[in-house]
């Protein structure tokens, strides 16, 4: 028998509960059949309910997410000292993973993204063997899991000399980020936050090149609601 079956059945009998909710979006057909046969209760799809419950985090959950973010920040502090011409995107990605695991992470929230030079135009680029060059922007998107909760951060660093246009774009993105943060408050929607950041970029003339949403929520999964 599955190790969880006896525990679940005992809990259901003790509480006299007859229905058990499950995340149907994440359960295989084989698992569903297995649990339907072995559990002494009715399985009821409850993905939407669980998603809504996870929208609000309690203090313990928040502290775990903060701890996960601190680990990622520690990795960033070190990796920026190591990014230089000749190092490949893959090497930076591997180093980020090592630093986060060494810093106390259980695992990665997702495979780190490291995109340099022209690869930075792809929001979900996969690290390649491309070597960092002088004058590159290097964008890193990464995070880790601590006690079951995810962190996620994106940072862009400049290597050596950058052009005036690159510096301008960097600062436009920074101001957009700050505008989004200022708009993120109780009662605001994800659309409100995105719109505040997007307006800064559009007003600067870069609207057509903003091909991604401003952000997303995190928790036990790397993408959670509200988005």
Feature roles, as predicted:
Residues 1-227:
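Active-site neighborhoods and metal-handling regions in enzymes and metal-associated proteins
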């Amino acid at each position: 028998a599955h190790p969880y079956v006896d525990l679940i059945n005992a809990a259901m009998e003790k509480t006299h509960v007859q229905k058990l909710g499950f995340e149907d979006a994440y359960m295989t057909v084989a698992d569903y059949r297995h649990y339907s046969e072995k559990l002494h209760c009715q399985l009821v799809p409850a993905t939407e309910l669980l998603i809504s419950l996870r929208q609000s985090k309690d203090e313990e959950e928040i502290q775990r997410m903060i701890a996960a973010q601190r680990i990622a920040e520690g990795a960033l502090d070190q990796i920026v000292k190591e990014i230089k011409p000749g190092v490949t995107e893959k090497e930076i990605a591997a180093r980020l993973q090592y630093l986060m695991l060494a810093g106390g992470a259980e695992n990665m929230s997702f495979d780190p993204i490291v995109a340099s030079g022209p690869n930075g135009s792809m929001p979900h680029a996969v690290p390649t063997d491309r070597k960092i060059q002088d004058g590159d922007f290097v964008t890193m998107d990464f995070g880790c899991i601590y006690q079951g909760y995810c962190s996620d951060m994106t940072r862009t660093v400049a290597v050596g000399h950058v052009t005036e246009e690159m510096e301008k774009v960097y600062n436009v993105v920074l101001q957009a980020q700050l505008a989004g943060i200022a708009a993120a408050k109780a009662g605001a929607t994800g659309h409100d936050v995105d719109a505040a950041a997007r307006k800064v970029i559009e007003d600067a003339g870069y609207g057509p090149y903003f091909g991604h949403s401003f952000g997303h929520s995190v928790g036990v999964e790397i993408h959670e609601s509200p988005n």
